[in-house]
Curated annotation (Swiss-Prot):
Disulfide bonds: none annotated. Keywords: Amino-acid biosynthesis, ATP-binding, Kinase, Methionine biosynthesis, Nucleotide-binding, Transferase. The keyword Kinase applies. Pathway: Amino-acid biosynthesis; L-methionine biosynthesis via salvage pathway; S-methyl-5-thio-alpha-D-ribose 1-phosphate from S-methyl-5'-thioadenosine (hydrolase route): step 2/2. This is Methylthioribose kinase.
Amino acid sequence: MSQYRTFTASDAVAYAQQFGGLSAPEALVSAQEVGDGNLNLVFKIFDKQGISRIVVKQALPYVRCVGESWPLTLDRARLEAQTLVAHYQHCPAHTVKIHHYDPTLAVMVMEDLSDHRIWRGELIKGVHYPQAARQLGEYLAQTLFHTSDFYLHPHAKKAEVARFINPEMCEITEDLFFNDPYQVHERNNYPAELEADVAALRDDAALKCAVAALKHRFFSHAEALLHGDIHSGSIFVADGSLKAIDAEFGYFGPVGFDVGTAIGNLLLNYCGAPGQLGIREAADAREQRLIDIATLWHTFAERFQTLAREKTRDAALAEPGYASEFLKKVWADAIGFAGTELIRRSVGLSHVADIDTIRDEEMKLSCLRHAIGLGKALILLAPRIENADEFIARVRQYG
């Protein structure tokens, strides 16, 4: 049996030749490390013509941006691969294809998406992909419905929950989303000028109680197999195409967490647009983000209800009207989780380029304050925002 070792570029080429599923594997001759994430090595594998044909991804046993002082389980590579395989089974159009994975080496071989772009980068530049929000809503509906109690037999669902237990990666989420921003912690990362804003988060008892309720749902509601980190940097887009990648945080959790994380990242772009684009372009981009959020939610909710009507196997859950009631709870959860995403990306360890790459420091501070204030408002108001129109009105109200 092979033992874990950190891959070099030549290791990645040899592995792709063996497991890439190409008809002429000997044509693969070189590799380039392209990963900019905190948790993994990612290699593009090129043929003799210099064309990227396949991707090899290997998990590292520590958080890359911190170093070996923050160790991580290598089992997350298995969990990521199996999450993506399961999601591909239910939504192949919008999930990256995994050709092979090895749990011992913590490595997987996947399709190359060089003809796509990372959605976050396109959003920052003001490039609009008209289909993206609808396709993301479709991906979320298909993957979350088909791994939920609506579709799975109870025995199969319980077995899947056990197979996807992911405590170490969930602990990272629990800390970064629900703990660190609301206490003094060395992982937090924000400009000194925001100290009063961050202190106000720590001192807000009502806010922290609402965050505690969201954390409790994250702990205890094993509703469906989540992607677990579905932000705009883990989504590739092209004309007419969207693909989800990077699912090492996959586990069974509340449906609203994936939906809310996606919405939260669109809102981060909304908050950062004035610092990235000209006045008119920023206004157009912000308006489009609100349309994208409404499109994402409506697509998700309508598809989920259609699937529930046509495919629900449990007699009680198939009761007319129940899926609609379930989605009301998902919506409230999603708004709250979107708020936690806004706050943690503004003051916590891991930021987003939508705001961090703004060159004007005063503008960056303004955008960060906007994200923090909007995040706080969404967390507190989530139970009272009944639909997408009300949601958009609230977002406009806070700038």
